[in-house]
Structure formats: C-alpha cells, structure tokens
From Swiss-Prot:
Gene3D superfamilies: 2.30.42.10
Disulfide bonds: none
Domain PDZ residues, every copy: 30-109
Alphabetized InterPro entries for the sequence: PDZ (IPR001478), PDZ_sf (IPR036034), PDZD9 (IPR039179)
Native organism taxonomy: Eukaryota, Metazoa, Chordata, Craniata, Vertebrata
Organism: Homo sapiens
Cited Pfam families: PDZ
UniProt-recorded name of the protein: PDZ domain-containing protein 9
C-alpha cells in the first residue's frame, strides 16, 4: 500500500511539471482593438503555419493600446481562429470588417522568434512611415539653399555643374503618361503606303506598250458572228483568221462609202 501511494505522488508531481511547462509554452495575451483607418495597426508575416506580428505601425490601434508586441503569434481575431491561416485567407477575413469594429485579439507570447531578415528592416517598410506635408516656408528655404549652393559652386567645371545641378522643387502636377503596349508596339500591323507609277516610261512600275499611230478599234459585229460559228466548227485557227479578215474588209468598205459620200 505504501508503494502504491508513493507511485501516485510521483505521477502527480510529473503531471504538475508537464502542466507548468505546457503553460509556459502556451503563454497567451488578450486585448481588444478598434479598427481604424490604418486597420489594426499591425505588420504581419507568415512564419511557417503561423501569422506573426513583426512591427507595430505608429499611431495605429495596436501601438496606442500597448499590449501587443512584435513576435506575438495570432491565435484568434474576433470570433475566427486564425491558426493555420495564410496571409491571403487573413486578408479576406479583414476585408469584411468595417472601421469602428471592436475585435478581440488573442496571441501567443514568446512562442517563436521573428526571422532575422525581418528584425531590422523597420525603415524599409512604407506602412510604418507617414508622409510629411511641407509648408510654403520650407519650400522657400529649399529654393534659397539651391540658389546659394549654385553661387558657391561657380568655380566648378561646367560638366560637373550640369551633372549635379539641383532643380528647384516644382508643385505642378504632371499627368502620368500611359505606357505603350508591348504587344501593339511589337506585333501591331503597320500600314505602309506604296505608290505605283503607271506610264510609257521605262522607269515606271507599270509600263504601257501602246502604238499611237494605230487607233483603238471597237469589237466588230463580224467577230461576234464568226465566234458563234466557231463554237459549232471544229477548226479554230481558220475561223479566227477569217474573223480578222472580215473585220478588215468591213472597215475598208466603210472607208470607201465615206469617200463616195464626200465626192457626191
């Protein structure tokens, strides 16, 4: 009986040690954040199967709250358990949340370390910086500095002056130029206008071979008659020669008739 009680005490001690170790590994932190114009104010990366906070955006909801820290791993956002979520799935979840919504955020603290490449790049993250609006006084001071610097550098060579010349700030907004489509520029059909010269000269593209002494004669009715007879006859060479002979005879007869009419 004493041995059995001693074993039970040992098992209880081991179980208590396991519980405390598990509790240390799963140390959690919980807070409530109000969604603002900057969202939750968190910069999150996907570290393996987890979503880990790397930086807090200045003046964001998380930075103003002060309870979340870089390195925390997200457990749940609102009613959604985000363990195993990808960044794409997490973004789809946040798209349905409007500004002013209060979300309960639950994270693991001291669970995994931030990757080394993400620890010292705060200055390279554009979301962590905010644009500083320049006043007209600052613009005037910048212009004065540019003119004084150009006066001090009068002894500098002309090439260096052109190379390192500081142009004054310009407040005029220039519209962005629409980029040219590569497919249209490379594969587009380009129309080319080609002119073709037609004439009697040898240098023309199309040369007309024509004798001005001979008049252009209209087709004779005799040719039609002989052509119809030619379809029924077997010899084509004799019919064509007869046709030209009949046509010439007809023109000779017409010439004689005109001479007789003039004489009379």
């Amino acid at each position: 009986m004493q041995k059995a009680s001693h074993k039970n005490k040992k098992e209880r001690g081991v179980s208590n040690k396991v519980k405390t170790s598990v509790h240390n590994l799963s140390k959690t932190q919980q807070t409530k954040l109000t969604v603002g114009s900057l969202g939750l104010g968190l910069i999150i990366i996907q570290h393996g199967p987890y979503l880990q906070i790397t930086h807090l955006i200045r003046k964001g909801a998380a930075a103003n709250d002060g309870k979340l820290q870089p390195g925390d791993v997200l457990i749940s956002v609102g009613h959604a358990n985000v363990l195993g979520y990808t960044l794409r799935e997490f973004l789809q979840l946040l798209q349905h949340i409007t500004i002013g919504t209060v979300l309960q955020i639950k994270v693991y603290r001291d669970f995994i370390n931030i990757p080394e490449e993400w620890q010292e790049i705060y200055d390279l993250i554009p979301e962590a910086k905010f644009p500083v609006t320049s006043t007209p006084k600052k613009i005037e001071l910048a212009k004065d500095e540019s003119f004084t610097s150009s006066d001090d550098n009068e002894n500098v060579d002309l090439d260096k002056r052109l190379q390192y010349y500081r142009y004054p700030w310009s407040t005029v907004h220039h519209p962005a130029r629409r980029p040219i489509s590569i497919s249209r520029d490379w594969h587009g059909y380009k129309k080319k206008n080609h002119t073709i010269s037609v004439g009697k000269d040898i240098n023309c593209d199309v040369m007309i071979h024509r004798d001005d002494k001979k008049e252009v004669r209209a087709p004779s009715p005799y040719w039609i008659m002989v052509k119809q007879d030619n379809e029924s006859s077997s010899s084509s060479t004799s019919s064509t020669s007869d046709a030209f002979w009949l046509e010439d005879c007809a023109q000779v007869e017409e010439g004689k008739a005109q001479l007789v009419s003039k004489v009379g």
